[in-house]
Amino acid sequence: MSSLLEQLIEAFRVLPGVGQKSAQRMAYHVLEREREGGRRLATTLANAVEKVGHCVQCRDFTESEICTICASSSRDRQQLCVVESPADRLAIEHATGYRGLYFVLQGRLSPLDGIGPRELGLDRLGERLAAGEVTEMIIATNATVEGEATAHYLAQLARQHAVRPSRLAQGMPLGGELEYVDRGTLSHAFGTRSEVL
């Protein structure tokens, strides 16, 4: 196998969920059938790596200093939704009518992996809360051990700045049937049930 082909296969392996076989299939596909697509991919990837950075206010991906959401005058500046990743921000933006601002952690607290408050930009988040414009922090971290630890830390940070923390509801999926829901989810949903209004 040629050295360039091996390098291409290894390059594809940096993508999440792509193992040796998938990377090999992708490399062969690009070289056998999609050379023009491969050139376009290479050019676009190089441009994105060079030009896409982080918004100075929310840490989401952007090509400018401030992203379009933070720059928008139509957003509610009193609400701040904290998410783990740009993909989480996009999911909320597409699935809800949320009109507030965001703060993207780019991860979650994980001391064993060397990810602490500094790596998540929580000093910048603290400064933003201290400015006094935000009145509610919506904590939208994942329901994992690290996500829950991060949510707890965020709630404490919000309270230190007299900001009301709230957490996304968790539990039964819409349209889900009880018999198919796992025990942990069902237990959590039952324990955090709310009054029907």
Curated annotation (Swiss-Prot):
Protein transport among keywords: no
Function: May play a role in DNA repair. It seems to be involved in an RecBC-independent recombinational process of DNA repair. It may act with RecF and RecO.
Name of the molecule in the record: Recombination protein RecR
PROSITE patterns: RECR, TOPRIM
Encoding gene, per UniProt annotation: recR
Keywords: DNA damage, DNA recombination, DNA repair, Metal-binding, Zinc, Zinc-finger
One Pfam family linked to the record: Toprim_4
Organism, scientific name: Xanthomonas oryzae pv. oryzae (strain KACC10331 / KXO85)
PANTHER family on file: RECOMBINATION PROTEIN RECR
InterPro entries according to UniProt: DNA_Rcmb_RecR, Rcmb_RecR, Rcmb_RecR_Znf, TOPRIM_dom, TOPRIM_RecR
GO biological process: DNA recombination; DNA repair
Family statement drawn from the similarity comment of this UniProt entry: Belongs to the RecR family.
DNA damage listed as a keyword: yes
Domain Toprim, first and last residues per copy: 78-173
Domain of life of the organism encoding this protein: Bacteria
UniProt zinc finger (C4-type) residues: 55-70
Molecular function in Gene Ontology: DNA binding; zinc ion binding
